[in-house]
From Swiss-Prot:
Regulator of protein phosphatase 1 (PP1) required for neural tube and optic fissure closure, and enteric neural crest cell (ENCCs) migration during development. Acts as an activator of PP1. During neural tube closure, localizes to the ventral neural tube and activates PP1, leading to down-regulate cell proliferation within cranial neural tissue and the neural retina. Also acts as a regulator of migration of enteric neural crest cells (ENCCs) by activating PP1, leading to repression of the integrin signaling through the rho/rock pathway. The keyword Zinc does not apply. Binds ppp1ca and actin. This is Phosphatase and actin regulator 4. RPEL repeats lie at residues 42-67, 588-613, 625-650.
Length: 706
């Protein structure tokens, strides 16, 4: 058959052709979206629309706005303890990679031997001379070349105790200088540096550290030479700096200038050689991203400070040591004669110098106004110089320390600056540390007059227990300090000075402009919500709570927020039109949200809204009433049977039966023949009426014989 091969085999009917109906290939049809899915999406959309947008939260002050660009200097560095800045906030992370390399070299490389101290580079900008020096001065004081040149190298290994290599990582990078300049400066000989191992400290305390009273006042430079530094600190008012915490810093920076007098200025300073150059921010702790926490500093090597070494050189071998391990809170750049470098203060902060034993906290008190770089503090135009006096100390070495007063020119300057003293205090009323209270409720104090006295805490070997105890003491101090907010001891007899902080409007505007440029960002970027009860007195907390509070960035940021009673920048004064506009905006938002709300019926249908009890009872009553009406109008079963409405299989008769013995083979349980006949008759009748049947076949329908 020729036509057979041409026929396609698919047309043949197979015996499984019917299976195609059941096993069809899967076709993707657009499925109708289910009701539950649609309802869920509506609920989610409604919830999302009810959320407040971020801008609104920021406007209402519940969220702090974090700007997009990463500003390197945080506007607010919450102080941890008496004026310390936290590691995360103190400095911008500039060249972390290079710094890590240097740190690794430093930790693996040279550690200071017992007799000598290697002074590593500090900062570039320190090289600038403040006054012209003659060649003889340059010859007499050899320049500390390495100490001020290398671009981003960490601090002196002498300043970092062998246990404490993490501290090296906290040095802030400075702008690198050309290699030619670095090479041209000659290194500092070891002979100029004071040996600083604790071993030697204990042995040579009596010889090395003479009190400053034994040093002639001419040993440190007179006020006329110090004067150019006012412009220096004014230039630096734009940087967050931690100003002098002790009288040491004033004389130390003076000596630093004298030592640095012969140095070659770096390129930035050559341009403005006529103007004195700012003393640099040499070190701030640098926030490292992935670095273990810094171990607590060990008591060794604590005064090994290049500036301290220079100071000892300039003062003819007598070395001053910082009075107290915990510096008081920051003082703004002075327009008066208190030159200082942050380098000194930061080094002392990070490394806890302990060249002299502790001074009790209640014997030293220093007035210090709030600092400018932190946004919640307001700068001060012309505050008096910090003054320090020592009451009779306990140990012999403390007596040595207490015998060293301020240099004469600084005391004269203090006397000129401070107003006339008020009546004397009894010695029990000492200036308490307002530090923690101030940070709990700092306020944007326009041009108000306020002052912040602060005690310098004990200088101890920083064990954890000591830290916690001193923190608790500080946190308990505000009650007594509130009663005497502006008292300070000057000289041997405690007298009182009032330190007014009058704020000129021009300075205030400048600082506000600077603060606007500075961001609130934190290394972790916590979401900051307002606390309404910030101003309440903080209760006594455990040492663990104090530790957590020190480390918790969110708590630190919240502690720096403004109290609600202050003139809050987040809620500025608005005109009536602005308020009306805001009300209209809120009203339209509320209307939109109300229109999106589901109705009560919707919610009831979805079992979200439960009816209240009264409604439920009323509904039950209504149902009962309807049922009873229906039942009362129903005809009885007998009536329905009579009217042939109900048939045999359509009803069940309910009879009341007495309890009886259901066991079989009782004569009264057996059906009598009459009962059986009645049953048969009924069944036959039922069957005969069930279907129409021909007469001749009717006998087939009999169910039982009659």
């Amino acid at each position: 058959m020729p036509s057979a091969p041409s026929t396609p085999p698919s047309k043949r009917k197979s015996k499984f052709a019917g299976f195609g109906k059941f096993f069809k290939p899967w076709k993707w049809r657009k499925r109708k979206s289910s009701d539950s899915f649609r309802e869920t999406s509506e609920v989610l959309e409604r919830k999302i629309s009810m959320r407040k947008p971020r801008e609104e939260l920021v406007k209402r002050g519940l969220l702090v706005e974090v700007p997009e660009e990463d500003v390197s200097i945080p506007s607010e560095s919450p102080p941890l303890r008496n004026g310390h800045m936290s590691v995360e906030h103190a400095n911008p992370p500039e060249d972390i990679g290079g710094l890590k390399r240097k740190t690794r070299q430093d930790s693996t490389g040279s550690r200071p031997k017992s007799g000598e101290t290697t002074v590593q580079p500090c900062a570039t900008a320190e090289v600038a001379p403040v006054e012209p020096c003659t060649a003889t001065e340059v010859a007499s004081v050899q320049p500390h070349a390495t100490a001020e040149v290398a671009p981003i190298q960490p601090l002196a290994t002498a300043e970092v105790s062998p246990v404490q290599h993490c501290a090296t990582a906290e040095v802030a990078p400075v702008q690198p200088r050309p290699v030619s300049e670095v090479a041209s400066v000659q290194p500092c000989p070891v002979s100029e540096v004071v040996p600083v191992h604790p071993r030697h400290l204990s042995e040579k305390n009596s010889e090395k550290y003479r009190p400053m009273s034994e040093v002639a006042p001419g040993a440190s430079r007179p006020t006329s030479e110090v004067a150019p530094l006012q412009k220096v600190s004014r230039d630096f008012s734009k940087q967050p700096l931690l100003p002098p915490k002790r009288p040491l810093s004033s004389s130390s920076s003076v000596t630093q200038e004298s030592v640095l007098g012969g140095q070659k200025p770096d390129p930035s300073t050559r341009q403005q050689s006529s103007v004195p150059v700012p003393t640099p921010r040499t070190i701030h702790p640098l926030p490292f991203s992935k670095q273990p926490p810094v171990p607590p500093p060990k008591p060794q090597n604590r005064s090994s400070n290049p500036l301290m070494a220079e100071l000892s050189l300039a003062l003819g071998g007598s070395t001053l040591s910082p009075a107290g391990s915990r510096p008081s809170p920051p003082i703004p750049p002075k327009r008066v004669v208190v030159p200082s470098t942050d380098a000194v203060n930061n080094k002392e902060k990070a490394l806890r110098p302990a060249s002299l034993p502790p001074i009790p906290a209640n014997e030293i008190s220093i007035p210090s106004p709030p600092s400018p770089p932190i946004s919640s503090h307001i700068p001060v135009s012309n505050p008096p110089v910090p003054m320090l006096t020592l009451a009779p100390p306990n140990t012999e070495v403390e007596k040595e320390q207490s015998a060293s007063p301020l240099p004469l020119h600084i005391r004269i300057q203090q006397a000129l600056n401070s107003p006339q003293p008020l009546p004397l205090l009894d010695s029990s009323q000492r200036a308490q540390s307002l530090l923690f209270m101030q940070n709990e409720v700092p306020s944007e104090e326009g041009t108000r007059v306020r002052s912040l006295p602060v005690t310098i805490e004990l200088l101890k070997v920083p064990d954890d227990d000591d830290d916690d105890n001193s923190l608790e003491d500080e946190s308990l101090s505000p009650e007594s300090s509130e009663s005497h907010p502006s008292r300070v001891y000057i000289g041997d007899v405690p007298s009182v000075t009032v330190i007014p902080n009058y704020l000129p409007t021009c300075v205030q505007e400048e600082e506000e402009e600077e603060e606007e440029g500075v961001s609130d960002t934190d290394s972790e970027g916590p979401v900051l919500y307002r606390e309404d009860d910030e101003e309440e007195e903080e209760e006594e907390t455990s040492s663990l709570a104090n530790k957590v509070k020190r480390k918790d960035t969110l708590a630190m940021k919240l502690s720096g927020r403004m109290g609600p009673h202050d003139s809050n920048p987040e809620f500025p004064q608005r005109s009536r039109e602005e308020w009306n506009q805001i009300r209209q905006q809120i009203g339209s938002q509320l209307n939109r949200r109300l229109s999106q709300r589901p109705s009560a019926e919707e919610l009831e249908q979805r079992n979200i809204l439960q009816k209240n009890e009264a409604d439920r009872l009323a509904e039950k009553k209504e149902i009962k009433r309807r049922l009873t009406r229906k039942l009362s109008q129903r005809p009885t079963v007998a009536e329905l049977v009579e009217r042939k409405i109900l048939r045999f299989n359509e009803y069940v008769e309910v009879t009341d039966a007495h309890d009886y013995d259901r066991r079989a083979d009782k004569p009264w349980t057996r059906l009598t023949p009459a009962d059986k006949a009645a049953i048969r008759k009924e069944l036959n009748e039922f069957k005969s009426t069930e279907m129409a049947v021909h007469e001749e076949s009717k006998h087939f329908t009999r169910f039982h014989r009659p």
